[in-house]
């Protein structure tokens, strides 16, 4: 059984990211994979290492600040989780959390401008294009890892 954690489901859900979890449920059901999804947020007792997959969506700046403060108590667990090759999917500004907490090796820099628009990506994982939308005011710098996607249209 796959144990999934939708972390900060209530306040990091700016663009209806709960639909990403529903899409994941649909795909797992279609493949007849057994899973359990827990929904946790601020003030919940969270045992990061109990999960096989963690998802964090996009939030407003106010929500981001609350989550950043809350995640500090899980920093070492998140580092171990990643070192153990477990999976975390973040969308939008949730990626910036891992820079601000210095969990991953990149720098997220806030800019005076916003990047808004649709993007088209390719990846070696699937044959089809991946289409997404960005509305952000941060730029990723000093990133030394191999990106998951290659941007074919838009800014990324």
Name each model feature, range by range.
Residues 1-76, 80:
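N-terminal beta1-alpha1 cap of cysteine-dependent amidohydrolase-like domains
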Residues 2, 35, 86, 128-130:
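A structural micro-motif
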Residues 7-9, 40-42, 58-59, 91-94, ...:
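Fold-independent oxyanion-binding glycine-rich loops
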Residues 29-33, 106, 140:
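Generic secondary-structure signature for well-ordered alpha-helical cores
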Residues 32-34, 83, 127, 143:
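Short, well-ordered coil/turn elements that cap or connect secondary structure elements
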Residues 60-127:
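Cysteine-nucleophile active-site neighborhood
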Residues 108-156:
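Amide-donor transfer/coupling interface in amidating biosynthetic enzymes
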């Amino acid at each position: 059984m796959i144990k999934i954690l939708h972390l900060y489901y209530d306040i990091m859900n700016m663009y209806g990211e709960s639909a990403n979890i529903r899409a994941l449920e649909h795909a797992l059901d279609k493949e007849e994979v057994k899973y359990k999804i827990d929904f946790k947020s601020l003030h919940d007792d969270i045992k990061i290492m109990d999960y096989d997959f963690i998802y964090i969506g996009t939030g407003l700046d106010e929500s981001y600040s609350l989550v950043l403060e809350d995640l500090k108590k899980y920093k070492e667990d998140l580092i171990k989780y990643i070192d153990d090759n477990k999976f975390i999917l973040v969308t939008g500004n949730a990626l910036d959390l891992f820079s601000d907490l210095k969990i991953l090796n990149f720098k997220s820099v806030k800019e005076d401008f916003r990047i808004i628009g649709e993007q088209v990506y390719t990846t070696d994982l699937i044959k089809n294009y991946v289409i997404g939308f960005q509305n952000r005011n941060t730029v990723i710098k000093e990133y030394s890892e191999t990106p998951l996607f290659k941007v074919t249209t838009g800014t990324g």
